[in-house]
């Protein structure tokens, strides 16, 4: 080992064995002197009747979750306390100029400020961090905490809703005459009167309000909620049991939901499915898929409704906005099933089962189509007279019969020749081949004419069903559009342009 190595070893041993620095000795001596006769179980006041003022402010770090189903808000906060402890004063000159000292918080008296409306039974802070002591006796303590607080969810306009959640803090043990809990920004307080529901009905109560009661300087923005306002309200209430008032500071967190997620995943699909209801009436009845489409739409809406039930709390106070829209759409789909059954019944009617009333033909065949912009196509070769084909067949048949009978005039009775121009004749009474042929041809002609008439009636029934489909198509399209606008547009947050604080 060379001389340089010996020198390094001496320096290292000196550093290890050297006593603490002067500052550390002073801080250690100060801590021992302060804690020597200190009783952390006793309220730090010089006289028993003296009131200890504790200033308190909430610093919101993160809004972790707002659980609508369980009505619980989870937050990550810092609880900023400050008070004067006369037992923790010292003269910096006597302790080497030490003006600030950090001590474990479990070695000094602490105010038992807890969250009253917690939802999981955890009233205390998460970590007992160190407290900051100043030579004049000021104690500052800002422990972090993750709280689950109760929050009554208003689902009336979900998912375009705004919520108001509260966090109520107060001393669990001391009354207002022993510990006066005040907001740290007391200089910004304003006094107002507030209506409060009491045991004997609504009463007026004096409340001290700080508009920006929560510190949002280190807030991490939420992906689901905008914070609109964070007032802090100080209440001083007296109860018949006690002489001392009980003081609490209630922080209100006004939230507005960011609607993009629910708009894309819930609103748009619901609106699209509702408009499919109208398209049912655009399908041809011969396809046989109208009822199937209606039932499929109804099942889809039921799935969305079950999804909504899993999200919102089980409340019977009000129906949420999206729930009203889904119910409205389900009613429309149910009506579309009923109407589709009626139109299919009309579509498949025939002369053997139903007789078409004259008013129905005039209304649905002659009157309504021109107002619905519908034009019925004419069959090929159709002219002004609908039964011209049968008239020509009858004329051909008459000419043929007259030709045959003209060559066999002895078979005709005298009345036949005299009335030939009226196409009436009398066949002989015997069963001649000519008589049988004429009767057969006449029967065939009548049968063809009846078939054509029946076919025309069937086509009229089908056309009436098409007209009904057009009427219901227009009606349901208008109903879907009108219902969508009226129901969705009722949400006040759609028109809310209030800038978010965070």
Curated annotation (Swiss-Prot):
- In its UniProt record, which GO terms are filed under biological process? calcium ion import across plasma membrane; chemical synaptic transmission; locomotion; monoatomic ion transmembrane transport; positive regulation of locomotion involved in locomotory behavior; post-embryonic development; regulation of egg-laying behavior; regulation of locomotion
Note whether Ion transport occurs among the keywords: yes
- Membrane-spanning parts: 264-284, 293-313, 326-346, 471-491
Can you quote a single GO CC term?
plasma membrane
| Cellular localisation | Postsynaptic cell membrane; Cell membrane
List UniProt keywords, sorted A-Z: Cell membrane, Disulfide bond, Glycoprotein, Ion channel, Ion transport, Ligand-gated ion channel, Membrane, Postsynaptic cell membrane, Receptor, Signal, Synapse, Transmembrane, Transmembrane helix, Transport
Q: What is its main location?
A: membrane
Gene inactivation phenotype reads: RNAi-mediated knockdown causes a resistance to nicotine-mediated paralysis.
**So which tissues is this one expressed in?**
Expressed in body wall muscles, in vulval muscles and in neurons.
What's this protein's function? Alpha subunit of nicotinic acetylcholine receptor (nAChR). Probably acts in cholinergic motoneurons to regulate presynaptic neurotransmitter release, thereby ensuring normal level of excitation of cholinergic motoneurons during locomotion. Involved in nAChR sensitivity to nicotine and levamisole.
Oligomer and partners: Component of nicotinic acetylcholine receptor. In muscles, composed of 2 non-alpha subunits lev-1 and unc-29, and 3 alpha subunits unc-38, unc-63 and lev-8. In cholinergic motoneurons, composed of 2 non-alpha subunits acr-2 and acr-3, and 3 alpha subunits unc-38, unc-63 and acr-12. Interacts with lev-10.
**Protein name per the record:** Acetylcholine receptor subunit alpha-type unc-63
* Organism whose genome encodes this protein: Caenorhabditis elegans
